[in-house]
């Protein structure tokens, strides 16, 4: 079974945090490949601030072209919109039946995961790797054990979950695409 990580996002724009995390994930987990899934739109974000999808796709390809095991995917571009993660994962399973998919998301997203469409389906059927999105997690970088602990949100306490793993040691990057766009407009 081929283990593929799905690291989805608008990548609007792609930045060193995305690239650094992708490199760390492929080097420090059991994934065979990490696919950066460029989303044509995010149902939880405003679409009017997005750069054209082909521009974002090209920028992500350029940013990770030299990282072995990291690929860029436009798979969601051919799916009905808006692009919901559950639909994407369902379609990936259909097209790649011999692959196992793991969702790679930020700690900020797992906190609101119960707002995602069909989040129960995702939790029950796919592994989820959670990377740090705040400074406290930076204390873990490079350590074999870590005091920064991650606990599943309260809404997940009584749910059937395939695997929910916090990526201890993953680097924290104090940057976001939202912050970059805000700086560019001022």
Where in this protein do the model-derived segments appear?
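Nucleotidyltransferase catalytic core that binds NTPs
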Residues: 1-186
């Amino acid at each position: 079974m081929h283990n593929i990580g799905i690291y989805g996002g608008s990548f609007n724009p792609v930045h060193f945090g995305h690239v650094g995390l992708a490199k760390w994930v492929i080097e420090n987990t059991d994934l065979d490949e990490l696919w950066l899934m460029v989303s044509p739109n995010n149902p939880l974000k405003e679409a009017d601030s997005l750069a054209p999808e082909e521009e974002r796709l090209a920028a992500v390809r350029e940013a990770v072209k030299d990282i072995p095991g990291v690929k860029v995917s436009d798979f969601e571009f051919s799916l009905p919109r808006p692009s919901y993660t559950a639909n994407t994962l369902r379609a990936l399973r259909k097209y790649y039946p011999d692959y196992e998919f793991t969702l790679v998301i930020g700690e900020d997203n797992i906190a609101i995961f119960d707002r995602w469409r069909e989040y129960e389906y995702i939790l029950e059927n796919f592994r989820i790797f959670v990377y740090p999105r705040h400074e406290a997690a930076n204390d873990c970088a490079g350590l074999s054990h870590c005091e920064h602990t991650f606990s599943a949100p309260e809404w997940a306490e009584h749910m059937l979950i395939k695997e929910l793993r916090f990526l201890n040691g993953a680097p924290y990057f104090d940057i976001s695409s939202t912050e970059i766009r805000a700086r560019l407009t001022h």
